Amino acid sequence: MARGELMKKLLASYGRDEDFRAVAEQIIDEEEKKNNRVLARTLRKTLEAGPQRTQSAPKALAPLIPFPEAAADFVERIEPEHNRNDIVLSAANVRVLLGLVKEFRRADEIRQHGLKVRSKMLFCGPPGCGKTLCAEIFAAELGLPLFRVKLDRLISSYLGETATNIRKTFEFARKQPCVLFFDEFDALARTRDDSGEHNELRRVVNSLLLFIDNMQPKGFLIAATNLDRSLDAAIWRRFDEVLWFDRPEAAMIGRFLKLKFKNVPVAFDPARNSAALEGYSFAEIERVCTQAIKAMIIERRKQVQERDFNRALQDEARRRAGQARLAPMI
């Protein structure tokens, strides 16, 4: 994006913490891509050292209706344990999510103009890249309870029962303001073109399409998948937004490393190792950081040394190599 446009967006967002920070992060990322690393580092330090957004008390959650027995077997309440400071997202995803939050807060006005409010999202990407964490934080930002669908209970071996269970779940979301979260969505929405699938699973997909079409939630429907290519082709247009959670690039890795070590004394700059971690998921990078911190604790030192980090990285690389050998067998 042209620098002039970014500066205009930055000034326009002044006073709105989320927007201001998102644009500032875009500017810093642009400088890093242009190899202006000293300037980027200075800007990031300035941003982090600025007045901290107050860690506001959790937003008041939407009132809970009495939990219906019909849905109790298929959904579980997830209590939020994280906030927006605990996640690193791409600038594109931040922009979409902020737009959805604003729409939700002005939903009545939008509907008065005869327009539809976006309420159905599909999260795609490899494991460990933040899909579930994003759903949790998104629900907390809206002040809505998060309910995760228990697929092991939802999917039944009895003819027609899975579709009945799906209907009960969607009826619950229609009455209860919430974020309804389907993880591993491909288990339900697998393509009907797969010759190995039997007629019952095809009927399940047909029912699912119908329920999503007719759903008018008081909150949001979020579905997440690691296997987007396995989804039925008709599923995609049922969602108002599709967000991609890819493995992070160097700039995002640097931010994530600083986040993971922010409360731990370190004897090196973790962000210097960003390039070595390209291609890793956030979950893998977090495991490297955790193991490095554990090494400091075990050896009773006051700081994490770079050698701790490097050893943890070597262990993770070994683990990845083993998984790569197994990949053709999975």
Curated annotation (Swiss-Prot):
Which Pfam families did the record assign?
AAA
The lineage's top-level taxon is Bacteria
Example GO molecular function: ATP binding
Q: Where does ATP bind?
A: 125-132
Q: Which residues form a coiled coil?
A: none
**Keyword Transit peptide carried by entry:** no
Provide this UniProt record's keywords sorted from A to Z.
ATP-binding, Nucleotide-binding, Plasmid
- Keyword Nucleotide-binding: yes or no? yes
Query: What family, per the record?
Result: Belongs to the AAA ATPase family.
Name assigned to this protein? Uncharacterized AAA family ATPase y4kL
Q: Which organism is it from?
A: Sinorhizobium fredii (strain NBRC 101917 / NGR234)
